[in-house]
């Protein structure tokens, strides 16, 4: 059985926490920031956990995570 390939784009976007859950960064932070409030931009800096509905698909494209 050959090795499974890791999706490199996904590998750069997701990390595993100590408890085994999957961490992700938030979207809407790269440009057009002037119209977004300071409070909104500050909350977008915080990492978030992947939804339970998406975990199965993430684990499929990241087999060694």
UniProtKB/Swiss-Prot annotation:
Residues 1-29 are annotated as: Disordered. The keyword Phosphoprotein does not apply. GO terms for molecular function: structural constituent of ribosome. One of its GO terms (biological process) is translation. Keywords: Ribonucleoprotein, Ribosomal protein. Residues 10-26 have a biased composition (Basic residues). The keyword Aminoacyl-tRNA synthetase does not apply. GO terms for cellular component: cytosolic large ribosomal subunit. Gene3D superfamilies: 4.10.410.60. Pfam families: Ribosomal_L35p. Belongs to the bacterial ribosomal protein bL35 family. This is Large ribosomal subunit protein bL35.
């Amino acid at each position: 059985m050959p090795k499974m390939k890791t999706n490199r784009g996904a590998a750069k976007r997701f990390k595993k926490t100590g408890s085994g859950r999957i961490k992700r960064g938030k979207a809407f932070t790269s440009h057009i920031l002037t119209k977004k409030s300071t409070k909104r931009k500050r909350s977008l800096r915080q990492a978030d956990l992947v939804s339970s509905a998406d975990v199965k698909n993430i684990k499929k494209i990241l087999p060694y995570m």
